[in-house]
Amino acid sequence: MESINQRKPSKMKIDHVAIAVNNVDEAAKEYQQALGISEVEFETVESEGVRVAILHLKDSRIELMEPTREDSPIKKFLTSRGEGLHHIAFETDSIESEVTRMKGCGVRFLGEIRNGSRGTKVTFIHPKSLHGVLAELCSHQK
């Protein structure tokens, strides 16, 4: 049996951590000040019903998400849980093969692979598959 130290590390990396907020402008200012980040990008993702502030860190980023409509999943999250950590995203080079591999391990997904912002392919892993944590798999255009 191989030991943990002999296993090859995953090629996945943490892409971003997403936080649901009521006011993305106020939250972005607070995060900028607290973390010493000079620039913030703002983007609206119509398909998800959110306005996002993107704060770049050394090897990943934080995405602050505010709902833009009542049927947004983020609006539902804020109503039931309040502000806070929404999901963690893992980047992979081949989202299709990772989804196939994970399904073979019994991992459940919330929907199919779809287009996210800026040509990124995304899908979400059901929280019951990861001990209560909602996770996103993403694959960026090269």
Please identify what each model-predicted range represents.
Residues 8-10, 32, 42-44:
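Hydrophobic, well-ordered secondary-structure scaffolds
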Residues 27-32, 102:
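Conserved active-site tyrosine of GNAT-family acetyltransferases
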Residues 2-8, 53-56, 90, 96-142:
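Vicinal oxygen chelate
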Residues 36-44, 106-113:
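Short secondary-structure junctions
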Residues 38-79, 118-141:
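Conserved short beta-strand elements that form part of the metal-binding/catalytic scaffold
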Residues 11, 34-36, 82, 131:
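Alpha-helix termination/capping residues and helix-transition junctions
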Residues 2-28, 83-92, 141-142:
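N-terminal beta-strand motif that seeds the catalytic metal site of vicinal oxygen chelate
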